[in-house]
Curated annotation (Swiss-Prot):
Stored CDD domains: MFS_MFSD5_like
Protein name: Molybdate-anion transporter
Gene Ontology terms: cellular component: plasma membrane
Topology of the protein relative to the lipid bilayer: Multi-pass membrane protein
Phylogenetic placement of the source organism: Eukaryota, Metazoa, Chordata, Craniata, Vertebrata
Organism: Xenopus tropicalis
Compartments reported by the entry: Cell membrane
Length: 452
């Protein structure tokens, strides 16, 4: 598995490069004015050099999080509880992050993210179980602030402070998404180098991330001005979101699909390490391969929905769910006790990540078109609750460290979950197949389809 993982990573990076090149040349550029504006380029650069260290710090923990808890000799059931606490924190933080960011200020929220994530990483140096749970809870809170705070600050400054055209926003976030893929791949390799090549142990990537967060905080304090969003009562936001869900069956189906799909992804995040680690798989390299597969999926989405191929986001969404179902079906066989096939499991995991790269932009496009902008925060809050509950219950109920086939049973249940998601997609498709609002124009792909 050692050499296989390295070859797979190189191949996936090459595939991503080819797909990204093809996607970039599949339609004419709509941002030539933005690229040629020196003030805009400088503003972008100032944002990126603050945002990217925070992204890198967030990614560095990914490859060795489960391994760290194993290194401290906790059982899989105990590790599952730590993860569930993180999911619970994400549920609560998801509900309050938007109003908190608006009231506290985006600049202060970015600083708060860095402080919370730093504290979370420092907690990982302790072997005390409740300290580790505290660290996971802090990590759950901080993850909800990452994208909402930084991107909300940039969007406000772009329009209000610098008065740049709104159509230039996708240029910034498209580039950020591409860089985010590269940063995630590099983070996996660096984490692998620290933990395995240098023999510093599974806690070392988290320690390495803290200086990056300090750098991000220093740049935010020195260079960014404060800005605030419109404040709405929490009850009103959630009430409006619930009414939108109940009055529009399409939104309810879309939320069900999101909860089913993403809860399976959360369980996959928990399971990939115990499946691959016993077979001498370099975890950082495997993580980088996952990120390369996801980035390739995002590039493939842009290519598939371009004017050259004319696929619609609904078709891509259906394809991504089919891919995950097939992957989970593979995993029920490749993880059978006494008959494990780690190479097949790795390929199945990579297919899941490729599907995620297709799923998220497709779901983002449909969400943007189906849910009114003023109600999106409230609706997304309601989406998050079943998502995290399904993931948490799946880990608590199904995973028994004393039962050899527990992992296989989890994949079987996840496959059934994806089958339910597929039925919801078919039901949604029958409702909206003639709805031109949910179709990309045949002349060119709209930027909103890849930015959500």
């Amino acid at each position: 598995m050692l050499l296989t993982a390295y070859f797979v990573l190189v191949g996936l990076i090459a595939l991503w490069a080819v797909l990204e090149f093809s996607a970039c040349h599949s339609k004419p550029s709509t941002s030539s004015n933005a690229v040629g504006n020196p003030a805009f380029r400088q503003f972008q650069y100032d944002f990126y050099r603050t945002y990217f260290p925070a992204l890198a710090a967030d990614w560095l923990q990914g490859p060795y999080l489960y391994k760290l808890y194993q290194h401290y000799h906790f059982l899989e059931g105990q590790i599952a509880i730590i993860y569930v606490c993180g999911f619970g924190a994400s549920v609560f933080a998801g509900l309050v992050s938007a109003p908190l960011t608006s009231r506290l200020g985006r600049r202060k929220s970015c600083i708060l993210f860095c402080l919370l994530l730093s504290a979370s990483y420092l907690c990982k140096l302790s072997q005390e179980y409740f300290v580790l749970i505290t660290g996971r809870v802090l990590g759950g809170f901080s993850s909800s602030l990452l994208f909402s705070s930084f991107e909300a600050w940039y969007t406000h400054e772009h329009a209000e402070q610098h008065d740049f055209p709104a159509e230039w926003l996708p240029h910034t976030f498209t580039r950020a998404a591409a860089w985010n893929g590269g940063i995630a791949i590099a983070a996996g390799v660096i984490a692998n180098a620290c933990a395995e090549w240098l023999g510093l142990g599974p806690a070392s990537p988290s320690v390495l991330a803290v200086p990056l967060l300090v750098l991000s905080v220093a740049l935010v304090i020195r260079e960014w001005d404060e800005n605030y969003g419109q404040t709405s009562s929490f009850r009103r936001v959630c009430g409006d979101g619930l009414r939108c869900l109940l009055r529009d069956r399409r939104v309810l189906l879309l939320g069900t699909i999101q909860a089913l799909f993403e809860s399976v992804v959360y369980i996959f995040i928990f399971l990939w390490t115990p499946v691959l680690d016993p077979h001498n798989t370099p975890l950082g390299i495997a993580f980088s391969s996952f990120m390369a597969a996801s980035a390739a999926g995002s590039s493939l989405y842009r290519l598939a929905t371009s004017k050259k191929y004319h696929l619609q986001p609904m078709h891509v969404l259906c394809l991504s769910i089919l891919m995950v179902f097939f992957s989970l079906f593979m995993l029920t066989f490749s993880t059978a006790p006494g008959q494990e096939h780690p190479t097949e499991s790795l390929l199945a995991f990579l297919l899941i990540e490729l599907a995620c790269g297709l799923y998220f932009p497709a779901m983002g496009f449909l969400r943007c078109r189906l849910i009114p902008e003023k109600e999106q925060i409230g609706v997304l809050n309601w989406f998050r609750v079943p998502l995290n509950l399904l993931a948490g219950l799946g880990l608590l109920v199904l995973h028994d460290s004393d039962y050899q086939s527990g992992t296989r049973n989890m994949f079987s249940l996840c496959a059934i979950t994806m089958l339910l998601a597929l039925l919801c997609v078919v039901s949604l498709f029958t409702m909206v197949r003639n709805d031109s609002e949910l179709r990309l124009p045949t002349s060119e792909t709209e930027p909103n389809g890849t930015e959500q």
